[in-house]
Amino acid sequence: MVPIRADEIRNLIRERIEQYNREVKIVNTGTVLQVGDGIARIYGLNEVMAGELVEFEEGTIGIALNLESNNVGVVLMGAGLMIQEGSSVKATGRIVQIPVSEAYLGRVINALAKPIDGRGGISASESRLIESPAPGIISRRSVYEPLQTGLIAIDSMIPIGRGQRELIIGDRQTGKTAVATDTILNQQGKNVICVYVAIGQKASSVAQVVTTFQEKGAMEYTIVVAETAASPATLQYLAPYTGAALAEFFMYRERHTLIIYDDLSKQAQAYRQMSLLLRRPPGREAYPGDVFYLHSRLLERAAKSSSSLGEGSMTALPIVETQSGDVSAYIPTNVISITDGQIFLSADLFNSGIRPAINVGISVSRVGSAAQIKAMKQVAGKSKLDLAQFTELEAFAQFATDLDKTTQSQLARGRRLRELLKQSQADPLAVEEQIMTVYTGINGYLDSLEIGQVRKFLEDLRKYLKGNKPKFQEIISSTKTFTEEAEALLKEAIQEQTELFILKEQG
């Protein structure tokens, strides 16, 4: 048996005592009174802040939203199935923030900025609050640079500028997501960082969008933030703010960003669910009273930075879904009043084969021609008016039996104008090609063709112009003006291509 040496034990104990550091920690704790439906009521937590993160005993995180006299209402950022009544909760002293870095480009993440694409972790050296204040009046400047969507109907008649907020609104299945994703595809090579936020959508729809981005090479400058329909309401409510924080990170680094919220109706529904479960008083359509503020504080973060801040920009394209074309419902009217214009997609146009189904008559951009290059202004200046007159005339012509020659030719041209606005999905056009297309239609060069031949002719003309008259593209891209030389080149190309096309059709 080994003898016990008292002096060794004494020295050991003394060493331990000397190493002891007395640390007093005050933790703000509470007790779970009730839990269910993604909401927990907590007794205690006396010094908790509104919006502060709290941590439950089993690891779930929640946000303190309701601060009442005798309890705190917390929304859970997870299922919270293991939380028990009577278990303890501690306040963390932190507001929701996410890590941000360039490494997020090309990744699919959730509302907490955790990767969900199975490609490992994302390194980040700094973090941002997901709810940061919007830029003030002095730190902004007016929108003046165009953000090309690649869609003729938008770029020629409802132009969007960098730093603008343009609402995409329409019924379900009218191609709202397609307009937004085409805009992202068109940013290739334009040094614009894109953030696509999917809120409450089917996982299969999100996967389809991600696949399109990967196939077209758009993922290298895009971040996808996804909270699907299976996610808790809290995370669906947070997802747009996470996307905005990531876009802001790049904007304040003097970069241009484009963010798409698809769609804000689902975020409002998630917020309504949370608010009703927290027993906040319901207002119009059972939405809480601060649902306007929910969207305004998000969309006000989109801006064109002033020269002193480096002229970065964040352009927002929020999407809102309507029920049977009713734009006077609560959420649509709210978002219309916050944004700088709206692109209205019509189910009737979509079903009649006009895609993108943009109703040019009631769509508007409040930034207007300030967000167009001079060449586009010169060519497409009166196209919106022409198209609106044609739509009115067409409605009237349904009841008229004998129409005079002028009316007939106006209707014929209008039909061809409408035809040239049609575009296939994921096939955005460069601004030079758009100018050529609009010029050809407005100046009557398509009048001699059948309506069925218009798209084929324009396709051939684009190829012909690119191959035989490369100077046209050079002039537009360098001067941004539709010069007399450019017009002469285009007229020549149209004439030559028309002759070739007619010969080909006859042959």
UniProtKB/Swiss-Prot annotation:
ATP binds at G170, D171, R172, Q173, T174, G175, K176, T177. It is a peripheral membrane protein. It is found in: Plastid, Chloroplast thylakoid membrane. CDD domains: ATP-synt_F1_alpha_C, ATP-synt_F1_alpha_N, F1-ATPase_alpha_CD. The keyword Amino-acid biosynthesis does not apply. One of its GO terms (molecular function) is ATP binding. Its EC number is 7.1.2.2. It holds the Pfam family ATP-synt_ab_N. Disulfide bonds: none annotated. The record marks S363 as: Required for activity. InterPro entries: ATP_synth_asu-like_sf (IPR023366), ATP_synth_asu_C (IPR000793), ATP_synth_asu_C_sf (IPR038376), ATP_synth_F1_a_nt-bd_dom (IPR033732), ATP_synth_F1_asu (IPR005294), ATPase_a/bsu_AS (IPR020003), ATPase_F1/V1/A1_a/bsu_N (IPR004100), ATPase_F1/V1/A1_a/bsu_N_sf (IPR036121). Keywords: ATP synthesis, ATP-binding, CF(1), Chloroplast, Hydrogen ion transport, Ion transport, Membrane, Nucleotide-binding, Plastid, Thylakoid, Translocase, Transport. F-type ATPases have 2 components, CF(1) - the catalytic core - and CF(0) - the membrane proton channel. CF(1) has five subunits: alpha(3), beta(3), gamma(1), delta(1), epsilon(1). CF(0) has four main subunits: a, b, b' and c. Produces ATP from ADP in the presence of a proton gradient across the membrane. The alpha chain is a regulatory subunit. Belongs to the ATPase alpha/beta chains family. This is ATP synthase subunit alpha, chloroplastic.
